[in-house]
Design a protein with these regions (language model features):
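Feature for intrinsically disordered/low-complexity regulatory segments and propeptides
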Residues: 1-166, 175
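Intrinsic disorder/low-complexity polar-acidic segments
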Residues: 157-229
Length: 229
């Protein structure tokens, strides 16, 4: 990475935390994430799952075939245990996509975990059989060499960088003296906390005197591409 402040989000467990005053770092990370993300519209009957077995010695060859990093292949072998064939080829599945995949495949998480641990070939067969009977389209989130979510075609995909821009514009109009308190990023969610202490009188003016002592008004924004759609 060119910027040492930016995080490589290839691994499923990648995350980043931001302290007060580090809003620019968060925004830069979100812009990098957007540059590394594609949303693919697929017919639900066109996507196909394959098992990803724990075969570290073959990871390099699999990575070449799928045109992804070896790191991504090894991580999926250890975690989600699935690859997905899309319009841009076969790609590893990230852990963050598992719940949305189970929703599409109409199987419970307990069933998924059992088959992932013991019978990955059976897992992909079950998913493919169910999807073959479904109709319509899905949106597939592909980011940092992996499939990160599978949602219905109605899902409104908005990048975190755009959400921050919308939030900034709103804050500029309503609370221009706000302060960035902290933030968090992972494949599962983005969380941003904004301190509105400069407007304490405005927010607490109708409360009894002394009731608001020790409290500070704030706004928390949470966004996720993992939630059900």
């Amino acid at each position: 990475l060119k910027d040492p402040d930016l995080v490589d989000f290839t691994l499923d467990g990648a995350e980043a935390q931001y302290k007060a005053g580090e809003y620019d770092k968060l925004l830069a990370q979100c812009k990098q994430d957007a540059a590394n993300t594609k949303w693919l519209e697929e017919g639900i009957r066109d996507i196909r799952f394959e098992a990803s077995h724990d075969e570290p010695l073959c990871a390099d060859e699999y990575a070449k075939q799928m045109k992804v990093s070896e790191e991504a292949v090894l991580d999926t072998q250890q975690n989600a245990g699935l690859n997905l064939t899309t319009c841009i080829g076969k790609k590893p599945v990230g852990d963050s996509a598992v719940r949305s995949i189970c929703d599409r495949g109409m199987i419970g998480m307990n069933c998924y975990e059992l088959l992932r641990k013991e019978r990955r070939e059976s897992l992909k067969e079950v998913l493919n059989l169910i999807l073959a009977e479904r109709k319509g389209a899905v949106q597939v989130k592909y980011s940092y060499d992996k499939v990160r979510a599978v949602h219905s075609a109605r899902y409104a995909a908005i990048g975190n960088d755009k959400l921050l821009k919308i939030m900034d514009d709103y804050m500029d109009q309503n609370w221009p003296d706000r302060e960035f308190e902290g933030g968090y990023l992972s494949h599962e969610l983005m969380k941003v906390v904004i301190d509105l202490g400069a407007y304490k009188q405005q927010f607490f003016r109708k409360l009894p005197s002394g009731f608001s002592a020790g409290y500070t008004p704030a706004v928390m924004m949470i966004s996720s591409d993992v939630a059900a759609s």
